[in-house]
């Protein structure tokens, strides 16, 4: 994690002791809850979400706000824990907040959506990719990221085309996000007529995967796909290298975090990952990227600009609706497209983006990435 992100983590964690933190620029405000992990093993993804959302709030307010009102960001910590996410969602409702950017993890997002939909709160997640989140006919739930059933086939087709002669294992962390995307990858690979030699789950939070790695070695595995997050992937990479497992590793956007390099060290070199397009490299975003850098913040984090876009969409939706009524804003979101740093975004009836691309990148030990052509 870069120094700017580390400072953000400490700041947000300190604020979370009180339950939430508020960023306000005027008495007449529209509150937006920023719900995600301030603490816990994947707090780095919450840092990305908050950095992007708070930058959008700051810039919108400097430009005059929304329909004469200023935006206010209110931080809530769910630690990416489903039970804590339910408590956060109830607090958001009790605090009278009508808009949410979050949650971050799919497993914590889904139970929170039930509360938001019932209580008339509009939510946009910049990071939760499980298809089930938007599959229940809800009208107030949206996302500015693609789905596992978009991302999984991208990885599966890549594996089938480039590693069809290798012995393949597909692993997952037994959680909604990780197991869901691993299942999509397995299905895509097998639909191409290629056998998956090992399909197995591990326990998120475990630290020792040597028994599993020994099993992979005995099976002659040469390529490993892991559905899950960077803490487990980093340990898998490091322990596989130490055990002499000669295999290429690949994962979803949940592994694309600079912290994985701190965990895996040189073993992170060459890891493959499906990630959103590198929006920070788009020339049209140069002024925005410079604004992040002026704050010593890293705009390349995979959820930074999707979170910025989520706030942008809420603000423009309120302008289109003419008022900060979540139901009317939801109608405006489905009826329009919105120019954002992550493209011109339009939403379908489910609240999903009509278009979103995942790209295969190669990870490097200095925490940079290169698109695989």
UniProtKB/Swiss-Prot annotation:
User: GO CC terms for this protein?
Assistant: outer membrane-bounded periplasmic space
Q: Known Pfam families for this protein? A: Peripla_BP_6 (PF13458)
| Sorted UniProt keywords | Amino-acid transport, Disulfide bond, Periplasm, Signal, Transport
Subcellular location(s) of the protein: Periplasm
* UniProt record, GO biological process: branched-chain amino acid transport; D-alanine transmembrane transport; isoleucine transport; L-alanine transport; L-isoleucine import across plasma membrane; L-leucine transport; L-valine import across plasma membrane; valine transport
Cysteine pairs forming cystine bridges in this chain are 80-105
Renumbered to this chain, the signal peptide range is 1-26
What the protein does comes down to: Component of the high-affinity leucine, isoleucine, valine transport system I (LIV-I), which is operative without Na(+) and is specific for alanine and threonine, in addition to branched-chain amino acids. Binds L-leucine, L-isoleucine, L-valine, L-threonine and L-alanine with nanomolar affinities. Can also bind L-homoserine with high affinity.
Q: Report the sequence similarity comment from the record.
A: Belongs to the leucine-binding protein family.
Protein's name according to its UniProt entry = Leucine-, isoleucine-, valine-, threonine-, and alanine-binding protein
Species assigned in the record? Pseudomonas aeruginosa (strain ATCC 15692 / DSM 22644 / CIP 104116 / JCM 14847 / LMG 12228 / 1C / PRS 101 / PAO1)
């Amino acid at each position: 994690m870069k120094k700017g992100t580390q400072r953000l983590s400490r700041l947000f964690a300190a604020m979370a002791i009180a339950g939430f933190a508020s960023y306000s620029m005027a008495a007449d405000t529209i509150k937006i809850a920023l719900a995600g992990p301030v603490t816990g093993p994947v707090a780095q993804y919450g840092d990305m979400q908050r950095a992007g959302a708070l930058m959008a709030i700051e810039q919108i307010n400097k430009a005059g706000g929304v329909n004469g009102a200023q935006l206010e960001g209110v931080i809530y910590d769910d630690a990416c824990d489903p039970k804590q996410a339910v408590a956060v969602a109830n607090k958001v409702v009790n605090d009278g907040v009508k808009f949410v950017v979050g949650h971050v993890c799919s497993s914590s997002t889904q139970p929170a959506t039930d509360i938001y939909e019932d209580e008339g709160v509009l939510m946009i997640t910049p990071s939760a990719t499980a298809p089930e989140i938007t599959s229940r006919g809800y009208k107030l739930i949206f996302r500015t990221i693609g789905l596992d059933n978009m991302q999984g086939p991208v990885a599966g087709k890549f594996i089938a085309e480039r590693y069809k002669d290798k012995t393949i294992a597909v692993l997952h962390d037994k959680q909604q996000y990780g197991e869901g995307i691993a299942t999509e990858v397995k299905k895509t690979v097998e639909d191409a007529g290629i056998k998956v030699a090992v399909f197995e789950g591990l326990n998120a939070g475990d630290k020792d995967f040597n028994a599993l790695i020994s099993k992979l070695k005995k099976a002659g595995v040469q390529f490993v796909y892991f559905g899950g997050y960077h803490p487990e992937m980093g340990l898998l990479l490091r322990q596989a290298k130490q055990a002499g497992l000669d295999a290429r590793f690949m994962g979803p956007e949940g592994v694309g975090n600079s912290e994985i390099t701190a965990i895996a060290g040189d073993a992170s070199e060459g890891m493959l990952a499906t990630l959103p397009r590198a929006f920070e490299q788009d020339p049209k975003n140069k002024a925005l990227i410079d604004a992040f850098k002026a704050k010593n913040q890293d705009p390349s984090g995979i959820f930074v600009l999707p979170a910025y876009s989520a706030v942008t969409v809420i603000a423009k939706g309120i302008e289109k609706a003419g008022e900060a009524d979540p139901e009317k804003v939801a109608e405006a979101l489905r009826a329009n497209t919105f120019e954002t740093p992550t493209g011109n975004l339009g939403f379908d009836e489910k609240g999903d983006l009509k278009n979103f691309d995942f790209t295969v990148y190669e990870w490097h030990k200095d925490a940079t990435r290169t698109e695989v052509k």
